[in-house]
Amino acid sequence: LAPADRDLAPGDPREIEIESSPHLVVTSLGGNDYNHQGGDTPSNASFTAASAAFTDSLFERYANPELVVIHICGMGSPAEAAFDPDNNRCRPCPHVRDATTAYVAANPTRRVHYLLVPCNGSVVDDVGDIGCNGHKNRLGQAQVADFLEPRIRSIMGW
């Protein structure tokens, strides 16, 4: 949409004031850093530093002592990898895991977790769950949600 057509979200969405503070933020990081980059991917050190800065920004932005941040990774399937071999959704996962582990070690009072959603077909099984350009459709998204829900529930103590 052209800027004049942005009636629902005028201005920079990063500057929208939020009235309340969430108890949970779930992120999916690393996919664009480690796929489709022609081999020009970040080092573990630079990715870990950027991930830490981003995670810090969440705690600064929301200033909720009860805030839980969960960095998820994966969510792929064999069909997605076959459709686009340079879009391996699990490729960034060791980097995201290591960055999260380093963050937790440096910030033990903050509730930050890592969750891997496998890419082996055990979650998104390639049966009617892939839509446009190899992305998950509504069924694929529901499969990921069904996998994550009990794990998030456990982390949150719900």
Give residue ranges: language-model regions.
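Catalytic His-Asp segment of secreted/periplasmic serine-dependent ester chemistry enzymes
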Residues: N35, M75-W158
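Surface-exposed acidic, glycine-flexible loop patches that form ligand/cofactor-binding
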Residues: R6-S20, D56-N64, A105-A106, R153-W158
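Conserved SGNH/GDSL esterase-like catalytic core that processes O-acyl groups on lipids
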Residues: L1-A52, E80-P94, G121, G131
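Structural recognition of the beta-strand scaffold that forms the well-ordered cores
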Residues: H23-S28, D33, V68-C73, H113-V117
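Extracytoplasmic, non-cytosolic globular domains
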Residues: P42-G74, P78-A79, N88-T101, L148
